């Protein structure tokens, strides 16, 4: 197979995301982990910080690269010559939303979406939940790559002053 995009906000990247990237990298020649820029969302980490953390956590995957994009994902796919999108699915709610997006992307551009069922060990994980639990002092160390865990705790401490 050729290349695939793995899009998301990745604020921050979790072990669940990393599992999807690893599995996608085993199926595609190239995987472009794409930080989608949403100017209406104020993240814990800015886009450059997220990209840096993604590069660090995917460095062991030689066919994975990191990029960012503002706009329609299918426009980025077209620009990159990529014809596939890979999304991890945690549950039926994810499926309903992602299926609708996949059908729209197919209609707009012909790009196919491939779904990877999330490893059950990570099926409850979301970046939002991890940030919330960490903010209140919960232990999320086994939910994040070590470098991300450290940066998250540092950022929470910075915000507390």
Curated annotation (Swiss-Prot):
Binding-site residues for substrate, renumbered to this chain: 9, 41, 73, 87
The protein's required cofactors: Mg(2+)
Protein's UniProt keywords contain Transport: no
Pfam families with a match to the protein in the record: CTP_transf_like (PF01467)
Site keyed Transition state stabilizer: positions: 17
Annotated localization: Cytoplasm
CDD domains from the UniProt entry: PPAT
Superkingdom field: Bacteria
Pathway assignment: Cofactor biosynthesis; coenzyme A biosynthesis; CoA from (R)-pantothenate: step 4/5
Example GO BP: coenzyme A biosynthetic process
InterPro entries named among the record's database cross-references: Cyt_trans-like, PPAT, Rossmann-like_a/b/a_fold
Catalytic reactions on record: (R)-4'-phosphopantetheine + ATP + H(+) = 3'-dephospho-CoA + diphosphate
GO cellular component, one term: cytoplasm
Main subcellular location of this protein, as a coarse class: cytoplasm
EC numbers on record: 2.7.7.3
Keyword annotations from UniProtKB, A to Z: ATP-binding, Coenzyme A biosynthesis, Cytoplasm, Magnesium, Nucleotide-binding, Nucleotidyltransferase, Transferase
GO molecular function, one term: ATP binding
PANTHER family cross-referenced by the UniProt entry: PHOSPHOPANTETHEINE ADENYLYLTRANSFERASE
Assembly description: Homohexamer.
Physiological role: Reversibly transfers an adenylyl group from ATP to 4'-phosphopantetheine, yielding dephospho-CoA (dPCoA) and pyrophosphate.
Protein family (similarity comment): Belongs to the bacterial CoaD family.
Protein name: Phosphopantetheine adenylyltransferase
